[in-house]
Amino acid sequence: MTIPLYTFVRGDSLGLILLVDEAHSIAEVATRAQRAAAMRVAPAARVGVYRAKVRLDPKLTVASAGLAPLDRIDILPEPLNGV
């Protein structure tokens, strides 16, 4: 099932509605969001996906993370050294 998500990539001047499949991993969602915003924001080497200020495990699927249509997610760059 396709789910539309309000997606905000740090540094982008626009919010995006990203269509994702419930079987996509959170890591795939992050990649797709960065590609969609790439004309305005250079993709970061490492990012976290957050919903309501809670970081989502990149291995979870959209469905297992409990994301619902029109939920907001934020894509935020993270340090490469993991700190």
Each PLM stretch: what is its role?
Residues 1-83:
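Ubiquitin system architectures
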